[in-house]
Amino acid sequence: MKAAIIGLGVEGKKASASFLQHDWQVYATDLNNKVDLSDFEIPLVEIDLIQDDDNISMITGSLTVDLGFFNSDEIDSSDVVAISPSMWGSAIAQKYLEEGKLLCDVLTAHKDIFTIGITGTNGKTTTVHMLKEILEESGKKVLVGGNAGGGFEGYYDLILKANSEDYDILLVEVCDMTLEFCDYFFNFDLLALTNIGNDHMDVHKTIANYKNKLMNFFKGKEIVLAHNQDFQSDFRGVASKSIPYYEFQGDLKIWGNVNKLNAGLATAIATYLKIPKNIIKDVLSNFEPVQGRLNVYKLNDSLIYIGKTDNVDATLSILNEKNFYATFIGTPRANEYHRLEIIDEIAKYHPEVVVLFSGLDDTIDMAVERFKELQYDGRIEIANTLDDIIFLLAEFSHEEAIFIGGNGQNTIIEIQERLKLLSDNCNNSY
């Protein structure tokens, strides 16, 4: 079969890779002629390349890529058209929906699997992994995935896998920017909300708009909400059933009140699915932090709290629990001004030292300027490399606590990996 991929952002690239892995012919296109194709990992000797000033065409094996233009004949001759979730609601998405060419309308086995969606601003990935481990320990075969930008292989990969093997449960992490897309592509039996926070405001514009999108998503479905969730009456009013969850009361290896809530949500869903209490308790008490998410390492006299906190609410959830001598913050993309609110809160918190490193983009100058505008008078350091970060951590490692967060999941994972080596070598694992 043949798939046409329109748009080569993170989701489009991963969709292309997934289709190829399932032995499909793939036509991939993007109007941006500067898309980085290195993610496809194709040896240059195997590529037929045609290039002019504005357009690039590449053919290799089962893959054809056009950049700067698209070939209508290639798209129309495809069995399936895969659009970026960000294109949902556009005229082109509507066209292929009406033609029945969207993947979820061609391959439909995934719609027969009991499907759980986890959405919200923070805590989705940790909750998904907690629940996955509980379900697998109880003997269920679980397929897990979600938004490609969140570290998974993408929504299309989920559908392809669900149509090639048998599973008991489909567990989907749903990005708050893809609610309408996922509502059409998946048949959710249960939806859960971790929380509502101030993120992706460049898309939602206001919390009220985000709330309204969630109400549409929850309409007619069974939902799981925190017992004190904002807008609870609105959500309950549109849902067919609402189940509350509370903080987990047992012991956890992972730190923080936010993780007690994540564990509480996983517990509520597992209880709904009639998983025995002893399995839930045993799995959660031994649950290890997800890569890139909040973890704690000991280095000399200091405890280092590190994890992606790419919005102001995630950052505050950490700052409100501990007194940190230094905070290391990864910077956002140049156009993500709403994420600079993280800096506003760091300035109010006023640690002795702020260390800035490039997270998603080299926007350190923008961050420094924001600190100056806020009249932060502590010490500001710039870390241009991983070695710079480790050097500064060593300098501060006799203080009680250090926080590393902000934007840039891949960079934060690299720091975690280096910290673990240092911590293990010092025989000081937390």
Where are these regions (language model features)?
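Short, basic phosphate-binding NTP loop
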Residues: 1-117
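ATP-dependent carboxylate-amine ligase
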Residues: 1-35, 42-50, 77, 271, ...
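Conserved hydrophobic helix-helix packing surfaces used for dimerization/oligomerization
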Residues: 3, 81, 115-116, 142, ...
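Residue-level detector of alpha-helix initiation sites
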Residues: 10, 122-126, 260
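Residue-level signal for inorganic ion chemistry
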Residues: 19, 81, 118, 173, ...
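A conserved, hydrophobic alpha-helical segment in the catalytic core
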Residues: 19-20, 184-198, 255-289
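Short, polar loop motifs at secondary-structure junctions
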Residues: 30-34, 70, 82-92, 176-178, ...
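Phosphate-binding loop of NTP-binding sites
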Residues: 72-76, 85-222, 232-237
